UniProtKB/Swiss-Prot annotation:
<feature type="disulfide bond">
    <location>
        <begin position="172"/>
        <end position="223"/>
    </location>
</feature>
<feature type="signal peptide">
    <location>
        <begin position="1"/>
        <end position="5"/>
    </location>
</feature>
<dbReference type="GO" id="GO:0008083">
    <property type="term" value="F:growth factor activity"/>
</dbReference>
<keyword id="KW-0964">Secreted</keyword>
<keyword id="KW-0732">Signal</keyword>
<dbReference type="InterPro" id="IPR020430">
    <property type="entry name" value="Brain-der_neurotrophic_factor"/>
</dbReference>
<dbReference type="GO" id="GO:0030424">
    <property type="term" value="C:axon"/>
</dbReference>
<dbReference type="GO" id="GO:0005163">
    <property type="term" value="F:nerve growth factor receptor binding"/>
</dbReference>
<dbReference type="GO" id="GO:0005615">
    <property type="term" value="C:extracellular space"/>
</dbReference>
<feature type="propeptide">
    <location>
        <begin position="6"/>
        <end position="114"/>
    </location>
</feature>
<dbReference type="GO" id="GO:0050804">
    <property type="term" value="P:modulation of chemical synaptic transmission"/>
</dbReference>
<dbReference type="InterPro" id="IPR020408">
    <property type="entry name" value="Nerve_growth_factor-like"/>
</dbReference>
<feature type="disulfide bond">
    <location>
        <begin position="127"/>
        <end position="194"/>
    </location>
</feature>
<dbReference type="InterPro" id="IPR029034">
    <property type="entry name" value="Cystine-knot_cytokine"/>
</dbReference>
<protein>
    <recommendedName>
        <fullName>Neurotrophic factor BDNF precursor form</fullName>
    </recommendedName>
</protein>
<dbReference type="GO" id="GO:0008021">
    <property type="term" value="C:synaptic vesicle"/>
</dbReference>
<dbReference type="InterPro" id="IPR019846">
    <property type="entry name" value="Nerve_growth_factor_CS"/>
</dbReference>
Length: 223
């Protein structure tokens, strides 16, 4: 999120950024990956197929989604994974949710989205962020919904042994544009700052009374 503070008198405009692609976060587009040949046309066709699959998955997700009156549904997150090793890719549901959120915010259909992606228009994100898998051993503690500090358990017992808890966290990049303020804010008049914001996810934790259970805890989820 971008926080704006009191106006400033004079500050020079400087800084540079990189392309930000909602959802998959890749730079460039399929047309720029190679020259105008059969391979490029094949990649474009593959992209259309991929987006068609995403559209079907999102339609199915809307059908099985719980009613809006269910508050737990609003707290659901795909950023937690139980695995025996570090996941190599972002969670699929996270990519789908991020992609859907962008479409909803832009109020456009999937077909319109294909012809107006940020990579083609040269758009830049307001704040640069970084996403990575974090283990419970690295987090150690977290704050639950009641405001209490709880211990995040590293391993979760399963019928055939134990699995580690991994959290997919997103925070402001220290090497990006954050130090210069929010991109797009006129520094001659405003002082801005990119800040990491948090959301609730469900994880296996232990409170100060040694009671183990699944609780909603806060983790970094956006910048």
């Amino acid at each position: 999120s971008c926080m704006k503070a009191a106006p400033m008198k004079e500050v020079s405009i400087r800084g540079q950024g990189s392309l930000a692609y909602p959802g998959l976060r890749t730079q460039g587009n399929l047309e720029t990956l190679s020259g105008p040949n059969d391979a490029t046309r094949g990649l474009t066709s593959l992209a259309d197929t991929f987006e068609h699959v995403i559209e079907e998955l999102l339609d199915e997700q809307e059908v099985i989604q719980p009613s809006k009156e269910n508050k737990d549904a609003d707290l659901y997150s795909s950023r937690v994974m139980l695995s025996s090793q570090v996941p190599l890719e972002p969670p699929l549901l996270f990519l789908l949710e991020e992609y859907k959120n962008y479409l909803d915010a832009a109020n456009m259909s999937m077909r319109v989205r294909r012809h107006s992606d940020p990579a083609r228009r040269g758009e830049l994100s307001v704040c640069d962020s970084i996403s990575e898998w974090v283990t419970a051993a690295e987090k150690k503690t977290a704050v639950d919904m009641s405001g209490a500090t709880v211990t995040v358990l590293e391993k979760v017992p399963v019928p055939k042994g134990q699995l580690k808890q991994y959290f997919y966290e997103t925070k402001c990049s220290s090497k990006g544009y954050a130090k210069e303020g929010c991109r797009g804010i006129d520094k001659r008049y405003w002082n801005s700052q990119c800040r990491t914001t948090q959301s609730y996810v469900r994880a296996l934790t232990m409170d100060n009374k040694k009671r183990v259970g699944w609780r909603f805890i806060r983790i970094d989820t956006s910048c």
